[in-house]
């Protein structure tokens, strides 16, 4: 079994929460992650619910400052955006990065501030899943470089996108979510599964179900990436690690940490235990792991870089 690829989530949300809006430190972290051998750099998305830097704009800067690491969204809400503009942005990003971008997407969690975000963007909440699916179909059609006419939520007549993406067909699309319907959609239509709420045992079962759905759809299930989005607070003092994780989750989401720990997979504790926890995901089939650190980014990056060869 090949070792998993390891990614690093840039702290765009944390920077805004603390009033440190400058982009220079974020770009320095991206460069540092690549120097340490991280395989990918990830950027979150939210307009008003959990404000942060615009992901596509920042991705372009990261692409210009790196040469090897993949760069992706964890995760973008395509339902909030016009898919013709989105296809144009991602084709350009794929060109800037020379084929290193990954389009991680989700339909959005059902919480009040995200519903408010959809209202602020003029998008009906109930339409989010249909908009996401149609937007991705339209993006792929435009990425082909062929003339596109489309009749649906959006109307397109004889449109040709240029430039086309660096990779024929466009960047891979990874989808969050772990419901039965969500994993069926991944298996039938997309290039990767990118959940954030499954322990290793549940992850293995759900990944197998996704691959079954792919085979049933006549697809090569091995061509679909099993990924995971995990949150870490590494500290040799387990109580201190727990306290830091709780403070991080409460400030990030504005909700009680015990509630968030039930929704998202987190680990707080010593480095050796963190290594074993990540290794359990690798054993469960995770091929690409995106790590979100609860503070102390440089120190935790160094720790993970030190033990990743043991995963």
Language-model features: where?
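N-terminal beta1-alpha1-beta2 module of alpha/beta enzyme domains
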Residues: 1-65, 126, 171, 294
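N-terminal small/glycine-rich loop or linker at the start of catalytic domains
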Residues: 1-18, 110-116, 151-171, 238-265
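Flexible, glycine-rich active-site loops centered on histidine and acidic residues
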Residues: 5-21, 79-149, 201-202, 251
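Hydrophobic faces of well-ordered beta-strands that scaffold small-molecule active sites
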Residues: 6-10, 41-43, 70-74, 101-105, ...
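Active-site mouth loops of central-metabolism enzymes
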Residues: 8-24, 76-83, 167-178, 232-233, ...
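Short, acidic/polar
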Residues: 20-33, 86-89, 175-185, 244-245, ...
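Alpha-helix-loop-beta-strand connector modules within alpha/beta enzyme cores
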Residues: 53-76, 131-138, 302-311
